[in-house]
Amino acid sequence: MISSNDFRTGTTIEIDGAVWRVVEFLHVKPGKGSAFVRTKLKAVKSGNVVEKTFRAGEMLPQAMLEKSSLQHTYMEGEDYVFMDMATYEETRLSADQIGESRKYLKEGMEVNVVSWNDTPLEVELPNSVVLEIKETDPGVKGDTATGGTKPAILETGAQVMVPLFLSVGEKIKVDTRNDSYLGRENG
């Protein structure tokens, strides 16, 4: 159990059999009446965001999530197959369970799979990944002076904005949290 006074960004709680993550919270102490905690909660499984208010000190069940490091080994139909490299146990997740993370997921990548009551909820990618540019407009000599960007499609199908001087076949580092270009990757 966790008190509403102890909420922090990222805290996970259980409400009506579902896991919710605290996205924002604000402790409010009005001049008249009792204190309360106004929160913005995100459903871990579906991604829905709701605003909910709790009395100060209200006790709620804390959802104990388990993180396991798994490697994406291959695709089977629409399912993504992950393997625990220590036990060689396979876990299958659908495209819906992976959600937006699938645009950066490639075979051989190590990810954290977050589970609750032995049910996989979400895939946590590393903060940055190295991917190859598969499709982009060719760079024209002299384009670098303006510092502009152009769209590029990466090997996983993700689309990011990259500097004009990059071309097809180059490996770049991308921030998975905000889809931004971080730099070229050497090697």
UniProtKB/Swiss-Prot annotation:
The keyword Cytoplasm applies. GO terms for biological process: peptide biosynthetic process. It is found in: Cytoplasm. GO terms for molecular function: translation elongation factor activity. GO terms for cellular component: cytoplasm. Keywords: Cytoplasm, Elongation factor, Protein biosynthesis. Pfam families: EFP (PF01132), EFP_N (PF08207), Elong-fact-P_C (PF09285). The keyword Heme does not apply. Pathway: Protein biosynthesis; polypeptide chain elongation. InterPro entries: Elong-fact-P_C, NA-bd_OB-fold, Rib_uL2_dom2, Transl_elong_fac_P/YeiP, Transl_elong_KOW-like, Transl_elong_P/YeiP_cen, Transl_elong_P/YeiP_CS, Transl_elongation_fac_P. It comes from the Bacteria. Involved in peptide bond synthesis. Stimulates efficient translation and peptide-bond synthesis on native or reconstituted 70S ribosomes in vitro. Probably functions indirectly by altering the affinity of the ribosome for aminoacyl-tRNA, thus increasing their reactivity as acceptors for peptidyl transferase. Belongs to the elongation factor P family. This is Elongation factor P.
